[in-house]
A protein has these predicted regions:
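Short, well-ordered beta-to-alpha junction loops that form the rim of enzyme active sites
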Residues: 56-58, 140
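Active-site Asp-x-Gly
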Residues: 66-122, 126-133, 137, 156-159, ...
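Residue-level recognition of alpha-helical structural elements
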Residues: 5, 26-30, 133, 154-161
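ATP/Mg2+ or Mg2+-diphosphate-binding catalytic cores
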Residues: 145-172
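Short amphipathic alpha-helical interaction patches enriched in hydrophobic/aromatic residues
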Residues: 20, 24, 95-98, 148
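Conserved ATP-binding subdomain of kinase catalytic cores across diverse folds
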Residues: 1-10, 121-134, 139-145
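Hydrophobic residue at the +6 position relative to the catalytic HRD Asp in the kinase catalytic loop
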Residues: 61-63
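An alpha-helical support segment within catalytic cores of ATP-dependent transferases
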Residues: 2-56, 66-67, 126
Length: 172
């Protein structure tokens, strides 16, 4: 699918990562995550070569229930990429909302976070039919991209969630 004026997911990754490499130059550890992300995304594109118009920011707070029309996705970014990419943001966002004792991700234990991620992978596998390992891959890809955007804008960002999601790649 080619739609004039809309970016591709490839472009999102390329722009964010080249900006990080050329300007942010924060740390080698995060660069290793970028390198892994590029490798994982190449595998995703090979496995899922067909592209679609995606929302680009599909997560819990961007899906609302409207009494007149039913469920509505709001705040679309519009990006072209493999369908499976859309799952990553939903899987990795708002984990703390499912942990009763946590008001932020920092309040949750690694085990609690991993249990939520593993459950979400199972649910998305059951609903979409996408392979759990591929779902873990796109979750990692999305988290690294989101973190890169934050770092490129000068925010101080922890790498804990990236490290935990990376562990999923070995577990599923």
């Amino acid at each position: 699918v080619a739609i004039d004026g809309l970016p591709t997911f490839d472009e999102w990754l390329s722009l964010a990562f080249s900006r990080f490499r050329n300007h942010t130059k924060s740390n080698d550890h995060f660069l290793s995550f970028i390198n892994l992300t590029e490798s994982l995304y190449a595998e995703i594109k090979t496995t899922y070569p067909e592209t679609f118009l995606l929302h680009g920011d599909l997560h819990h707070e961007n899906i609302l229930r409207d009494d007149a029309v039913g469920w509505v996705a709001i705040d679309p970014k519009g990006v072209i990429g493999p369908k499976i990419i859309e799952c990553g943001r939903f899987i990795q966002n708002f984990i703390e909302d499912e942990i009763p004792s946590a008001t932020s991700l920092g309040d949750a234990t690694d085990k609690e976070i991993m249990l939520i991620l593993e459950e979400r992978l199972k649910v998305f596998n059951n609903v979409t039919g996408f392979d759990q390992h591929h779902l873990a891959m796109v979750t990692f890809i999305d988290q690294v991209l989101s973190t890169c955007w934050s770092m490129n804008s000068g925010q101080v960002v922890g790498l804990r969630k990236i490290k935990l999601i990376k562990n999923l790649l070995n577990d599923v």
